């Protein structure tokens, strides 16, 4: 595992979704609806965030006959990291937008 999290726009979007209520457990399907990301994009991001220990993941028992569901929430480090990543991402993109306006 690389020592640095790859910060894509999609990863920022997922982190931002968790920041809406950092203590809440979230389902992948719910996150997919919130972010608009397809499962093939979302689940690798969730796995990577869990690998970096920014998310905790567990299985939730469901009604009889239904399979258990994976649920996720931010860890304390994940909350701190999400806030830092989103702040730096926002600043970087604000500068890029300002530079583009100056150039045009």
Residue ranges and their predicted role:
Residues 2-41:
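N-terminal helix-turn-helix DNA-binding core of bacterial DNA-binding proteins
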Residues 42, 46-52:
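Basic amphipathic alpha-helical segments that dock to polyanions
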Residues 52-67:
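Beta-hairpin "wing" of winged helix-turn-helix
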Residues 33, 43-44, 74-75:
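A generic structured-segment signal
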Residues 64, 68-86:
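Basic, amphipathic "hinge/linker" alpha-helix immediately C-terminal to the N-terminal HTH DNA-binding motif
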Residues 21-24, 51-53, 77-80:
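Short, charged/polar surface micro-motifs in flexible loops or helix N-caps
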Residues 80-104:
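Amphipathic alpha-helical dimerization/coiled-coil segments
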Residues 47, 60, 84:
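Surface loops and adjacent helix of pleckstrin homology
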